[in-house]
From Swiss-Prot:
The lineage of its organism: Bacteria, Bacillati, Cyanobacteriota, Cyanophyceae, Synechococcales. GO terms for biological process: amino acid biosynthetic process; aromatic amino acid family biosynthetic process; chorismate biosynthetic process. It is found in: Cytoplasm. PROSITE patterns: EPSP_SYNTHASE_1 (PS00104), EPSP_SYNTHASE_2 (PS00885). GO terms for molecular function: 3-phosphoshikimate 1-carboxyvinyltransferase activity. Phosphoenolpyruvate binds at K23, G97, R126, Q173, R354, R396. Its EC number is 2.5.1.19. This is 3-phosphoshikimate 1-carboxyvinyltransferase. Pfam families: EPSP_synthase.
């Protein structure tokens, strides 16, 4: 794969695009299908590094997952809640925090079995205690470096007990790990979040037959009861709105552009970017709405807009657009006035420190971006000059810098551009098609 990409500024985007399957749903379809009874067929799976790491780990746990080919449905033979095997080797999660955190929850209650999880250099420096601590409250035996906060992680499967757990931050990965553990815990497990996070796990568990309910203000309290069994399903995975966001913003800020993004997941816990686009005054409409397997989908048509307004992102909306902050930082550079991103310290422990990296790289174009402890301040109406920028191995940074390059005067280079393949393997081909 080409590690350096050259992007010419001054072109517009025209056409339609179908983004890859949702990464969050792809992980969950594999995991929940593996512990269901019977067969689960998955269509629209994201064929990229992170979900494939999940598939590889599940195979080592004895799950029959065939070779996954691009753009082809496949069928898993589930083992039931008690059928996972003790692996003969270490489970390598690659660069995928979702894989590691969800597997911690899945495996904590697999009694009398031992599991070791590791990842690449980057993943092994990311915080895992936020999952390990609540699982320990349920009786989980989880160990790792730095008092259980860093991988490699060792799990001694143990009998778990249901309890009420309040999470300090709204995190779908933490919540999902607790809910997966709750399937094997005695009694009832309740998760209470400070704000609602993405709810793909709850929707999918319910579709598979789990006894799960969502309560409280804004769905912040999720309750799951053990004792049932999951039944295999047919899962159609919609396009990932986090991947669609690059085209949504590009079409908004690049003059004379019009893009139709087809079959995008519109789960309300993921559509914070639409709220921000409304604040900006973007020109878009949602077409062909429908619901498949409990997940709302539709197509998004976006046209370029003049005189976009600055915006502030803070508080409860953060979990609904946490992965879109890099591309929204690019958008802010071309709005009138000063935009601000607050309460976003979670971005410092993603694949990279995304606040620091986005500020550093956009400044190379001439952007006025100031880094704060919990966010960024962006002075809009920037005039971008061409630059040599670096993804610093972060997929969302790579794609955000590509869109920024379209607004630069001259030709820019993006180093380590192949990082995009982590979540969007065909990004560069789709960019070429839309700008041709």
């Amino acid at each position: 794969m080409n590690n350096i990409r050259t992007i010419k500024g001054g072109v517009n985007l025209k056409g339609k695009v179908k983004v890859p399957g949702d990464k969050s749903i792809s992980h969950r379809a594999l995991i929940i299908g593996s512990i269901a009874n019977g067969e689960t067929t998955i269509e629209g799976f994201l064929h990229s590094e992170d979900p494939l790491s999940t598939a590889d780990c599940l195979r080592k746990l004895g799950v029959n997952i065939p070779e996954i080919k691009k753009n082809e449905p496949f069928t898993i033979s589930g083992l039931g809640l008690d059928g996972l095997k003790e692996p003969k080797e270490i489970l390598n999660c690659g660069n995928s925090g979702t894989t590691m955190r969800l597997l911690m929850g899945l495996l904590a209650g697999q009694e009398d079995k031992n599991f070791i999880l590791t990842g690449d250099i980057s993943l092994n420096e990311r915080p895992m205690g936020r999952v390990g601590k609540p699982l320990s409250l349920m009786g989980g035996k989880i160990f790792g470096r730095e008092k259980g906060n860093k991988a490699p992680i060792s799990i001694d499967g143990n009998k778990l007990k249901g309890c009420v757990i309040g999470t300090p931050v709204a995190s779908a990965q933490v919540k999902s790990a607790i809910l997966l553990a709750g399937l094997k815990a005695s009694g009832t497990t309740s998760v209470i979040e400070p704000a609602s996070s993405r709810d793909h796990t709850e929707r999918m568990l319910k579709a598979f037959g789990a006894d799960i309910s969502v309560r409280g203000e804004l769905g912040r309290n999720v309750v799951i009861k053990s004792g049932g069994k999951l039944i295999g399903q047919r899962i159609l995975i919609p396009g990932d709105i986090s991947s669609a966001s690059f085209w949504m913003i590009a079409a908004s800020i690049v003059p004379n552009s019009e893009v139709l993004i087809q079959n995008v997941g519109l789960n309300p816990t993921r559509t914070g970017i639409l709220n921000v686009m409304d604040s900006m005054g973007c020109n878009y409409e949602i077409l062909d709405k429908s619901t498949i397997a409990g997940e709302p989908i539709g197509s998004i048509k976006v046209k370029s807009s003049n005189n976009l307004k600055s915006f502030t992102i803070e508080g409860d909306i953060l979990p609904k657009l946490i992965d879109e902050i890099p591309i929204l930082t690019v958008a802010a550079c071309f709005c009138n006035g000063v935009s601000e991103i607050k309460d976003a310290q979670e971005l410092r422990v993603k694949e990279t420190d995304r606040l620091k990296v986005m500020a550093r790289q956009l400044q190379k174009f001439g952007a006025e971006v100031t880094e704060k402890e919990d966010g960024l301040i962006i002075n809009g109406q920037s005039k971008f000059n061409s630059a040599e920028v670096d993804s610093e191995t972060d997929h969302r940074v790579a794609m955000s810098l590509a869109i920024a390059s379209l607004l630069a005067k001259g030709t820019s280079k993006i180093m380590r551009a192949d990082a995009a393949s982590v979540s969007y393997p065909t990004f560069w081909e789709d960019l070429a098609t839309l700008t041709n």
